[in-house]
Amino acid sequence: MKELMNVSTIGFDVAVIGAGPAGISCAASLADIGLEVVILDEQANPGGQIYKNIEKVSDACLKILGEDYKAGKPLVQRFRNSKLTYFSGACVWQVNTDGHIFYSKEGNSHEIAARYIVVATGAMERPVPFPGWTLPGVMGAGGANNLIKNGGVKPSGRVVLAGSGPLLLLEAVHLIEMDVEIGAILETTPAVPNLSSLVNLPKALKRIDLLKKGIVMLHKIRKAGIKHYKGIRNLTAKGNDRVESVHAMKADIPLDIDTDLLLVHFGVIPNTAIFRQLECRHQWNDVQRYWFPQCDKWGRTSLDNVFAAGDGCFVHGAVSAALKGE
């Protein structure tokens, strides 16, 4: 694999944007059949958000992050062994429909061109504004998880987690294993599942492995004696120069919890910035509540030379993203 620092306009068969599981799987597969492939990513190393720093993570952090994170190692190793061009630390800021891509690296702007473009920019945490969300000390649970991956960095002081989704519980488990004090978990998920969610129960039962992972996480949280509230509303972060406490309502009961850090997570959505810049056709998913680019079964968007791979076109998770990249 060639890793270039500076380059003028160069032509490639395919340019892949994003070096997460979908991007590196796609790039490696294309390189295997002899195509000239370039892949660009803003991070210093391949792996995306889900497998961030997988090549350099310590054994102690690897134990905390678990087998799902460890599964990224063979993907990255295959990518490293592929004959392709890799631009790390490259921030793509413009993509044209004619295949020209503009990006910045180390303070300089560059341009490359490709016959086909694969956008594999993955997912992002869903931004949900609430009173006090811009206070210092309020951050995404995914961001906190990345700090663990990057260097085993753990929060100091007391932490409250709020929002919904499995990543919220996963982050809580990671913090428990790092001996971080957790003041409470405030879930917006209803305490009693509504009828619309019960419709999906038969499908859920087909993935007993995932249900088991969820049960194990809940058991660890319960065993640690952490207060876990469900069905909360009116989430508010309070403080002067930084967050000092969290307020929420549980039914008609007010909750006020002192904290040094509030980690929030409300699920993930496709990162569609490049698709929107290219004016690819999008559609709305009424269940997941997000826009995503329309694609055929091969990932081709409404533009003949632009393809989508991974969670950037619909969120299915890292394993599925790698397969879609293939």
Describe the residue ranges of each PLM region.
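Residues forming the flavin
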Residues: 2-326
